[in-house]
UniProtKB/Swiss-Prot annotation:
It comes from the Eukaryota. The modification Phosphoserine is found at residue 217. Ca(2+) 2 binds at residues 261, 319, 321, 327. Binds 3 Ca(2+) ions per subunit. The ions are bound to the C2 domains. Residues 93-103 have a biased composition (Low complexity). Residues 12-38 are annotated as: Cysteine motif. Ca(2+) 3 binds at residues 321, 324, 327. Its cofactor is Ca(2+). It comes from Rattus norvegicus. Residues 160-172 have a biased composition (Polar residues). The gene is Syt6. This is Synaptotagmin-6.
Length: 511
């Protein structure tokens, strides 16, 4: 019966009430045990053992859960209070501060208000240095105190640098401008505590002095370039014999030649040309195992006096090698034979031997004029003439013509050419080539002038090239800038022809 207490609806309740009334009757009806009726009367539904036990278990479980939750919340708040609450941390940090004078200065409210006065005292700067070191690792120091200390140290650093650093030359100011400013605690001015020797020297340890490194690197680069270009000197003399119409070249001696052999010496000799004629090649004797040879040899070049102004003297110094190709030491090119005198008497000349790996070939020169009309956007190149061109045919002549290419960003936009002049090394053209170029595009274009040799059977060969434009070098850039500076006026110049090292690279020949 106890298992069904509280179950069912009104009928069950009515049945239970009837059973309870029967049990209370005296004597009980037949079929009912007296002990059963007593237990039924003494244990009402709300006091049954099973119901009491289940209620007690649920209550105990709820109490345990509540207690555990309260404990976890208490632990969480305790940890938060210990770790994150700033007033407690300031209180804990202030307890050992009495042992540290720097901390007392930085933590006391009065010191914060009078920090500017205390910074002026030299005796407090020792504590400031410790405070700066602490501020890099501990967040206990307030931000405004740290900022004031840093500003004071930076101000003293600048004053100390201005008074103790030597003035550097203007040669290195551009390099120093790119170096970052660094603050060092050791560079603080300590007043009269430092000895005079220490006050005279910069106290910022670890600072880079760019003038030392740059001076060394500049000197090293200059020495390296001089060593690369210096190949000794050569002494020769020139004299013209008017009776025989002969130019007499006397090779006297060479001095301080570079060593080409493993034993530290060379076997030098000299080749002599009177350009543009390369067929007449003269050569000195070979001098063995010496870097300062004495030649003292005369060489005769038959040439009319009127042609001397168009001739160049080319001296090539070689090292003789019996078993392999002769090594070139360097060369000397004398463009003006009348540089030293009028050649009526013998004149001694000293020249530096220029470094060269192979004999430079005189390809000739071309003369042309440039004229630009900004309003019409028209560029006119007039090919006037060429002289002393290189002979490309077996007959000793060439069939030259000039090809002009308009280049923009490495691409060839247009090309035009002159007529062909047969069997000549000094052609005269006087032909105009016109290109339409807007003024806003003049900084993006250049002209490539190629002197070609016409061949009826095979491919036409390039004798030499030159280039004018903003991206050109030397005379090519100067000629272009002069044309832009004087519009509507033809500007004419002679240009030397150069070899093409590589035919085409991205549409542009390399000179």
């Amino acid at each position: 019966m106890s298992g069904v207490w509280g179950a069912g609806g009104p009928r069950c309740q009515a049945a239970l009430a009837v059973l309870a009334s029967l049990c209370r009757a005296r004597p009980p009806p037949l079929g009912l045990d007296v002990e059963t009726c007593q237990s039924f009367e003494l244990q009402p539904p709300e006091q049954s053992p099973s119901a009491a036990d289940s209620g007690t278990s649920v209550s105990l479980l709820a109490v345990v859960v509540i207690v555990c939750g309260v404990a976890l919340v208490a632990v969480f708040f305790f940890l938060f209070w210990k770790l994150c609450w700033m007033p407690w941390r300031n209180k804990e940090a202030s307890s050992p501060s009495s042992a540290n004078p720097a901390s007392e200065i930085l933590q006391s409210p009065s010191s914060r208000g009078n920090m500017a006065d205390k910074l002026k005292d030299p005796s407090a700067l020792g504590f400031l240095e410790a405070a700066v070191k602490i501020s890099h690792t501990s967040p206990d120091i307030p931000a405004e105190v740290q900022m004031s200390v840093k500003e004071h140290i930076m101000r003293h650093t600048k004053l100390q640098r201005q008074t103790t650093e030597p003035a550097s030359s203007t040669r290195h100011t551009s390099f120093k401008r790119h170096l970052p400013r660094q603050m060092h605690v050791s560079s603080v001015d300590y007043g009269n505590e430092l000895p005079p020797a220490a006050a005279e020297q910069p106290t910022s340890i670890g600072r880079i002095k760019p003038e030392l490194y740059k001076q060394k690197s500049v000197d090293g680069d200059e020495a390296k370039s001089e060593a690369a270009k210096s190949c000794g000197k050569i002494n020769f003399s020139l004299r013209y014999d008017y009776e025989s119409e002969t130019l007499i070249v006397r090779i006297l001696k060479a001095f301080d030649l570079p060593a080409k052999d493993f034993c530290g010496s060379s076997d030098p000799y000299v080749k002599i040309y009177l350009l543009p004629d390369r067929k007449c090649k003269l050569q000195t004797r070979v001098h063995r195992k010496t870097l300062n040879p004495t030649f003292d040899e005369n060489f005769h070049f038959p040439v009319p006096y009127e042609e001397l102004a168009d001739r160049k003297l080319h001296l090539s110094v070689f090292d003789f090698d019996r078993f392999s190709r002769h090594d070139m030491i360097g060369e000397v090119i004398l463009d003006n034979l009348f540089e030293a005198s009028d050649l009526s008497r013998e004149t001694s000349i000293w020249k530096d031997i220029q470094y060269a790996t192979s004999e430079s070939v005189d390809l000739g020169e071309i003369m042309f004029s440039l004229c630009y009309l900004p309003t019409a956007g028209r560029l006119t190149l007039t090919v006037i003439k060429c002289r002393n061109l290189k002979a490309m045919d077996i007959t000793g002549y060439s069939d030259p013509y000039v090809k002009v290419s308009l280049l923009c960003d490495g691409r060839r936009l247009k090309k035009k050419k002159t007529t062909i002049k047969k069997n000549t090394l000094n052609p005269v053209y006087n032909e105009a080539i016109i290109f339409d170029i807007p003024p806003e595009n003049m900084d993006q274009v250049s002209l490539l002038i190629s002197v070609m040799d016409y061949d009826r059977v095979g491919h036409n060969e390039i004798i030499g090239v030159c280039r004018v434009g903003i991206s050109a070098e030397g005379l090519g850039r100067d000629h272009w800038n002069e044309m832009l500076a004087y519009p509507r006026k033809p500007i004419a110049h002679w240009h030397c022809l150069a070899e093409v090292k590589k035919s085409f690279k991205e549409g542009t020949p390399r000179l």
